[in-house]
Amino acid sequence: MVCLGSGCEPRAVGDYLERLVDLNGLAVFVQTLLPAFNDAVGEAWASGRLGVHMEHHYTEAVRQTLYTGLAKLRASNAKPRVLITTSPGELHGLGAMGLQVALAVQGAHCVSLGTQTPVEEVVSAAVSMDICVVAISASVNQPPQELLAYLVALRKSLPPPCRLWAGGRGLLALDGQLPQGIDHFQSVEEAVAAWRLLLHVS
């Protein structure tokens, strides 16, 4: 994003993102534009072309934009209900929040537990809230084998009818390693399409 370069005004990023939402709609923003922006910012940060403070500034601007979008959506209690979080040690939550907004636009009832939720807490929430899908978002910063162990433990602990979804660039390192019962989605669009299918059978 050009507006993250040197001399960027504090409000410029937020204003730019809000204009994109107004022009394209919230669904297109979270399913198409936001993933591309997140990848570009992550790569720029990893290569040293973007300072930590600007990466944090971008993250907060996105959060505020998504919070604003969520606040405008009508609350839903419809099934299938989706619980969204990240594994312990995974602080990056933009992917999870983007999925939450994308599903909420479709009318889904989403429960966000924020980031870094232990297995036992996810399971407890899923059971008590009658959750149909648990969705885990993972960035490239998450050690692959730690992520795999977390997903396997979740699958073993969740009630069999509860589906377990996983997505984000952190899953790329686990290609072919995910056991049966864990659905890997490579894009927000795929997850939204899967939720729509569940909607018709719930």
Feature names for model-found ranges:
Residues 1-74:
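Long amphipathic alpha-helical segments
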Residues 49-51, 56-202:
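C-terminal regulatory/effector modules of DNA-binding transcriptional regulators
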